[in-house]
């Protein structure tokens, strides 16, 4: 497979959907971004694409309840899933959302990878582990980005990355763990390389 290098700066907004059933047809390749409401998901997407307002960062965690789709190239889509685990969202809504999220991760044919974003200071909460579990059971590769890495010293950062790498071994999946900071541009290149790899089957001769 030839190595490809997509230009993520050309990424543009495609559409929003109120729920999993409303997202566009199951074609091309999709890569989903998931994370707790305050994990810095929108910030990471904006850093990857070098666009300040591509993904709206909300001052109110849990506000982004829509699924937002972005197109990098024709048939190459990034899917921004609503933040999970925010207390102010009604319990019934949470349960419904988690159910459809599990279905999406396990049944969506064009889904090629999952990026899970977690605050480096509070990684692997219950719902993060649930996401990883669903992905692994669907044979979906996972990139765990430990966000806000600039909040820790370099040695503390390395320690956290090592701890998370050891903690995920029992999942026995294809899981890569990297530190990430939009502010200090840590891990953006590694994210782009991983996305290129996941999108590459579309460009195979």
Curated annotation (Swiss-Prot):
Amino acids binding GTP: 35-42, 62-66, 80-83, 147-150, 180-182
Family matches, as InterPro entries: G_ENGB_dom, GTP-bd, GTP-bd_ribosome_bio_YsxC, P-loop_NTPase
Keywords recorded for this protein, A-Z: Cell cycle, Cell division, GTP-binding, Magnesium, Metal-binding, Nucleotide-binding, Septation
Ligand binding (Mg(2+)): 42, 64
Domain EngB-type G: 27-201
Family statement drawn from the similarity comment of this UniProt entry: Belongs to the TRAFAC class TrmE-Era-EngA-EngB-Septin-like GTPase superfamily. EngB GTPase family.
Protein name: Probable GTP-binding protein EngB
Organism: Haemophilus influenzae (strain ATCC 51907 / DSM 11121 / KW20 / Rd)
């Amino acid at each position: 497979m030839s190595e490809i290098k997509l230009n993520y700066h050309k990424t543009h907004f495609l559409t929003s959907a109120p729920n999993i059933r409303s997202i566009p047809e199951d074609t091309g390749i999709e890569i989903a971004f998931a994370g707790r409401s305050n994990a810095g998901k929108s910030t990471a997407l904006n850093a990857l694409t070098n666009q300040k307002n591509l993904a709206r960062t909300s001052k109110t965690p849990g506000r982004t309840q829509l699924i937002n789709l972005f197109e990098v190239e024709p048939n190459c889509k990034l899917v921004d899933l609503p933040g999970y685990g925010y207390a102010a969202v009604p319990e019934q809504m949470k349960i419904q959302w988690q159910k459809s999220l599990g279905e999406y991760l396990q049944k969506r044919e064009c889904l090629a990878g999952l990026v899970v974003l977690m605050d480096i200071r509070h990684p692997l909460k219950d719902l993060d582990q649930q996401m990883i579990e669903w992905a692994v059971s669907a044979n979906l590769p996972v990139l765990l980005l430990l966000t806000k890495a600039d909040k820790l010293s370099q040695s503390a950062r390395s320690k956290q990355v090592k701890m998370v790498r050891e903690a995920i071994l029992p999942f026995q999946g294809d899981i890569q763990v990297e530190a990430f900071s939009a502010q200090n541009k840590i891990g953006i290149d590694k994210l782009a390389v991983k996305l290129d790899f996941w999108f590459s089957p579309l460009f195979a001769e």
